[in-house]
């Protein structure tokens, strides 16, 4: 349903943001 789609998008965005912050903090960017 719509809510689960929104939840999945929010989870993906949060994961991306967290990965980016970790990467900047540790200097271990892969991209």
Curated annotation (Swiss-Prot):
Alphabetized Pfam families for the sequence: Antimicrobial_2 (PF08023)
Record organism: Lithobates palustris
Cysteine pairings via disulfide bonds: 23-29
Function: Antimicrobial activity against Gram-negative bacterium E.coli.
Keyword Disulfide bond: yes
Family of this protein: Belongs to the frog skin active peptide (FSAP) family. Brevinin subfamily.
Tissue expression profile of the protein: Expressed by the skin glands.
GO cellular component: extracellular region
Keywords, alphabetical: Amphibian defense peptide, Antibiotic, Antimicrobial, Disulfide bond, Secreted
GO BP of this protein: defense response to Gram-negative bacterium
Presence of keyword Disulfide bond: yes
Full protein name: Palustrin-2c
Lineage, highest ranks first: Eukaryota, Metazoa, Chordata, Craniata, Vertebrata
Chief location: secreted
InterPro entries listed in its UniProt record: Antimicrobial_frog_2
Protein location: Secreted
